[in-house]
């Protein structure tokens, strides 16, 4: 039977064409794809034990609830996956909801939002006893012990308990329950260590205030994630380097490149932008609270930044100042003219120890580091990176304000016990782009990647070279699309002949 061409056939052809076009490879897409994230959590009976004693103000308790919600968001919640219970405590213990109560993430999050503080004393031992003997029991929804099901308790507290936690914690650990202890503010750190499982550096966390407790959420999201290495399996879209983390990955670039805003592709870094000069000075806290092993990680962090700079007399210069109770200039701007020499000097830097005089160090930066006599160049962008792990023992506000008033681009990097208010005082505007915090020295390399993007200014998108590159890219995409359309047209012609 002969089928003639007509409106119906034209409509059919158009639909076929659209279906085939939908199969055009993703590589032709002009829209950046999001960074990879895939996480499956192993089946877990998880109980939060949350201190809401009178020392925890209502606004601070709200921040705890945000932290809890962020951790829950990352879990596979369900009767056969992760079950979550919550125990609220002060002088008494109040079970907010048992493990069996909520089979979905949405209902769990609603239950967390409804929790109110109790506002009396601090009976942490009593709360732990309840969590272990009641909250994880069969009657409350706890499952039978099995190698396939984890039993986890996370304690959040900000004070010294009015009872003992040692014995009950030992019994819990002996029975196979994994204990995490999170301390806030003036918490008794010895108590945290008595509660937590080994290794303690993975099970004890401390933050200066409730304002930064949310920053711990990522750690717990990764702790519960058991998905395979996405970089090793090739399930990523990074142009150069893939850096794996549990259930996720981030893209990185080779030495001399910086990551673009799409989080996947890389550009050559030119120190303060193509053809511009940057004077960059690191102001590094070498106080005793840092500890020698962490100071070595700080040195690696510095060299990670140096690796991305185009070091030369015309472009990027680097200086380094270490401070504690006193200030020591390790090397001024312009002393070293190659990355290799700068990195060697950083590796050879010795650890000062003693106190934390951040205010005096900032004043030194202003009065000495960015002067012509110390190698600074008139007209060059002035960038200061302040790295600290604790509260300053002197006043920082005046010096921090003056540095920004002079036009210095100031970045503040805090680790562990660093005080958020001080970091924000140091950071340039917008503060969100110039202030960085992590709870653990082991993760400062992630801050390094973010800093690289801020220091390395993108070239002018309207510059002639950029326009030519864009035009060439678009032309290539159009040619590829044209070839695809020609192939589709050929297939349609063959199909039409067969039908006829």
Curated annotation (Swiss-Prot):
CDD domains: vWA_Matrilin. InterPro entries: ECM_Assembly_Org, EGF-like_Ca-bd_dom, EGF-like_dom, Matrilin_cc_sf, Matrilin_coiled-coil_trimer, VWF_A, vWFA_dom_sf. Keywords: Coiled coil, Disulfide bond, EGF-like domain, Extracellular matrix, Glycoprotein, Repeat, Secreted, Signal. Disruption phenotype: Knockout mice are phenotypically normal with the overall length and shape of skeletons and skeleton components at birth comparable with wild types. Histology of proximal tibial growth plates of 15 dpc embryos and mice at birth show no morphological differences. Collagen fibrils in the collagen matrix surrounding zone of maturation chondrocytes and zone of hypertrophy show an abnormal unidirectional organization and also contain sporadic larger diameter fibrils at both 15 dpc and at birth. No change in deposition of Acan or type X collagen matrix in the proximal tibial growth plates at 15 dpc. Residues 471-499 form a coiled coil. The keyword Disulfide bond applies. It is found in: Secreted, Extracellular space, Extracellular matrix. Residues 30-226, 268-457 form the VWFA domain. GO terms for biological process: chondrocyte differentiation; extracellular matrix organization; growth plate cartilage chondrocyte morphogenesis; regulation of bone mineralization. GO terms for cellular component: extracellular matrix; extracellular region; matrilin complex. N-glycosylated; reduces binding affinity for type 2 collagens. Glycans are attached at residues 80, 348. It holds the Pfam family FXa_inhibition. Residues 227-267 form the EGF-like domain. Disulfide bonds join 231-242, 238-251, 253-266. One of its GO terms (molecular function) is calcium ion binding. It comes from the Eukaryota. Residues 1-29 form the signal peptide. Transmembrane segments: none annotated. Expressed in femoral head articular cartilage. Expressed in the trachea and extraskeletal tissue around the eye. The keyword Secreted applies. Homotrimer. Part of a complex composed of MATN1 (via VWFA1 domain), type 2 collagens and type 6 collagens. Forms a complex (via covalent bonds) with ACAN; the interaction increases in abundance with increasing age of the organism via an increase in occupancy of MATN1 binding sites. Interacts with COMP. A major component of the extracellular matrix of non-articular cartilage. Binds to type 2 collagens and forms long concatenated protein networks as part of the extracellular matrix. Required for the network-like organization and bundling of collagen fibrils surrounding chondrocytes in the zones of maturation and hypertrophy. Required for mechanotransduction and adaption to mechanical loading in cartilage chondrocytes, resulting in an increase in expression of the extracellular matrix components ACAN and COL2A1. Acts as a moderator of angiogenesis in response to injury. This is Matrilin-1. It comes from Mus musculus (Mouse). The gene is Matn1.
């Amino acid at each position: 039977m002969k089928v003639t061409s007509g409106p119906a056939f034209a409509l059919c052809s158009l639909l076929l064409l659209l279906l085939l076009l939908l199969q055009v490879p993703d590589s032709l897409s002009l829209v950046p794809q999001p960074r990879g994230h895939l996480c499956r959590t192993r089946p877990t009976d998880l109980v939060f034990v949350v201190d809401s004693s009178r020392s925890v103000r209502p606004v601070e308790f709200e921040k705890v609830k945000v932290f809890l919600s962020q951790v829950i968001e990352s879990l596979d919640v369900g009767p056969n996956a992760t079950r979550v219970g919550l125990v609220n405590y002060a002088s008494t213990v109040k079970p907010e909801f048992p493990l069996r109560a909520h089979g979905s993430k949405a209902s769990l999050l609603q239950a967390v939002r409804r929790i109110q503080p109790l506002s009396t004393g601090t009976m942490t031992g009593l709360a732990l006893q309840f969590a272990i003997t009641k909250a994880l029991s069969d009657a409350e929804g706890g499952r039978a012990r099995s190698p396939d099901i984890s039993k986890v308790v996370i304690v959040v507290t900000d004070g010294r308990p009015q009872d003992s936690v040692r014995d009950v914690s030992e019994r819990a650990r002996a029975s196979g329950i994994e204990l995490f202890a999170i301390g806030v503010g003036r918490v008794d750190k010895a108590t945290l260590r008595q509660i937590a499982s080994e290794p303690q550096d993975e099970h004890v966390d401390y933050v200066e205030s409730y304002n930064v407790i949310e920053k711990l959420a990522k750690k717990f999201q990764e702790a519960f994630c058991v998905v395979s290495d996405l970089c090793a399996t090739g399930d990523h879209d990074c142009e150069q380097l893939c850096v794996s983390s549990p259930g996720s990955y981030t893209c990185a670039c080779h030495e001399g490149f910086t990551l673009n805003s799409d989080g996947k592709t890389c550009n050559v870094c030119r120190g303060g932008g193509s053809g511009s000069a940057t004077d960059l000075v690191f102001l590094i806290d070498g106080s005793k609270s840092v500890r020698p092993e962490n100071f070595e990680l700080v040195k690696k962090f510095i060299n990670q930044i140096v690796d991305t700079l185009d070091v030369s007399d015309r472009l990027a210069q680097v200086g380094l100042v270490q401070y504690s109770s006193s200030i020591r200039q390790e090397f001024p701007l312009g002393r070293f003219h190659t990355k290799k020499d700068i990195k060697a000097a950083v590796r050879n830097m010795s650890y000062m120890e003693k106190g934390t005089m951040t205010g005096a160090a900032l004043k030194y930066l202003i009065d000495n580091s960015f002067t012509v006599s110390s190698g600074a160049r008139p007209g060059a962008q002035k960038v200061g990176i302040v790295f600290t792990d604790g509260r300053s023992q002197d006043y920082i506000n005046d010096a921090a304000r003056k540095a920004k008033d002079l036009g210095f681009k100031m970045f503040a990097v805090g680790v562990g016990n660093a005080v958020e208010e001080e970091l924000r005082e140091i950071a340039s505007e917008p503060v969100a782009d110039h202030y960085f915090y992590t709870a653990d020295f082991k993760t400062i390399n992630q801050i390094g990647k973010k800093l690289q993007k801020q220091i390395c200014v993108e070239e002018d998108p309207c510059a002639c070279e950029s326009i030519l590159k864009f035009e060439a890219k678009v032309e290539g995409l159009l040619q590829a699309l044209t070839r695809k359309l020609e192939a589709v047209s050929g297939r349609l012609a063959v199909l039409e002949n067969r039908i006829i």
